[in-house]
Each structure stands twice: as structure tokens, then as C-alpha cells.
Amino acid sequence: MRYEYVPLKDQYEKEIVPALMKEFNYKNIHQVPKLVKIVINMGIGEGSRNYDLIERHANELAKITGQKPIVTRARKSISNFKIRKGMPIGLKVTLRGARMYNFLYKLINIVLPKVRDFRGLDPNSFDGRGNYSFGLSEQLVFPELSPDEVRRIQGMDITIVTTAKTDQEARRLLELFGMPFKRG
């Protein structure tokens, strides 16, 4: 395995772990919460009728994450949405390891500052088990995509999965990484 310098992982090991151990009085280093994975989900409503649309968004998501997305399919038929079981309805990428840390770094330092009218992430979007989810309304905020090659603006959901037992621990972990939460 080749060695790759990952700035956020280095910061986690040298600064964040000691700070969390002191703040939450952990006895063992393995009690300290850490990032497990980041899941990026892009639901494509018209994807079931237009396979070219799924291909285009799959290429965009691959450029953004550096990893090929998988196509998510409908689990059951819903006649009101004109969806049959097995139809493609979205794309999903699960990032772990160095790609996860690099994506989080890019998200915090490049992408979120480019979002229009951004006043911070909602601190109440934790799920009760230490995982954080939020949505982006357009994919154009990522530097890998140029406005000329994007034909249709599409949002995405991003879920950050941690080993934290409580939302308070997870929020503090993400704050130490530099995640911009709303104050108040």
C-alpha cells in the first residue's frame, strides 16, 4: 500500500484525538469517536425514464468523488410516481479512508464557502446516533465541474457516519475538523 499524505487524518491523529480525550474524559484512545464513512446520495426522479440522465450524473458524481457511483434501484413499485420495482432512481457513493478525508477537506474548505447564502450547517441534523446528514441543492459548487458541462442542476444528500455514541460527541468531532455549524 502506498503512503499518501492526508491533511485531515494527520490533524485528527495529532490534534483532535487528544482534545476529545481531554474534553470527554476518555480512558482509552479507542473510545474517541472517528469518521467511518461518507455517503453521497443523488436521487434522480426522471432517471427511471431517461437512462442518459443517469449516465451524465454518474460521470459528474465520479468527478466529484473520484470513485464510480453505484446505481440505486427502486425496492418496490409506486404507481403515483410511475416507478416499477428495479427501476434506476438514483446514484450512491460510499467513501472511506483517504478518499473520505480528502472529500471532507474539500467540502469544508472549498465547497461550503461557495454555496450561495450559506450561514452554516444546521446543528440539529444529527440522527441521535452520532451521524450527520445534510443536503446540497446543486452540484456546481464543486470545483471539478464547470458550468458548461452541467446540463441539469441536481442536488445531493451527504451523510457523515461516525463511531460517536451521542450527537454531542459527533458535533464536537466535526467542529474540530472545521465543519461550519450555525451559532445559536
From Swiss-Prot:
Disulfide bond sites: none
Cited PROSITE patterns: RIBOSOMAL_L5
Keyword tRNA-binding in record: yes
GO biological process per UniProt: translation
InterPro entries associated with the record: Ribosomal_uL5 (IPR002132), Ribosomal_uL5_bac-type (IPR020930), Ribosomal_uL5_C (IPR031309), Ribosomal_uL5_CS (IPR020929), Ribosomal_uL5_dom_sf (IPR022803), Ribosomal_uL5_N (IPR031310)
Keyword DNA damage part of the UniProt annotation: no
UniProt xrefs under Pfam families: Ribosomal_L5, Ribosomal_L5_C
GO (cellular component) term, any one: ribonucleoprotein complex
Alphabetized UniProt keyword annotations: Ribonucleoprotein, Ribosomal protein, RNA-binding, rRNA-binding, tRNA-binding
Example of a GO MF term: tRNA binding
Stated role: This is one of the proteins that bind and probably mediate the attachment of the 5S RNA into the large ribosomal subunit, where it forms part of the central protuberance. In the 70S ribosome it contacts protein S13 of the 30S subunit (bridge B1b), connecting the 2 subunits; this bridge is implicated in subunit movement. Contacts the P site tRNA; the 5S rRNA and some of its associated proteins might help stabilize positioning of ribosome-bound tRNAs.
HAMAP family for this protein: Ribosomal_uL5_B
Quaternary structure annotation from Swiss-Prot or TrEMBL: Part of the 50S ribosomal subunit; part of the 5S rRNA/L5/L18/L25 subcomplex. Contacts the 5S rRNA and the P site tRNA. Forms a bridge to the 30S subunit in the 70S ribosome.
Family: Belongs to the universal ribosomal protein uL5 family.
Listed name of the protein: Large ribosomal subunit protein uL5
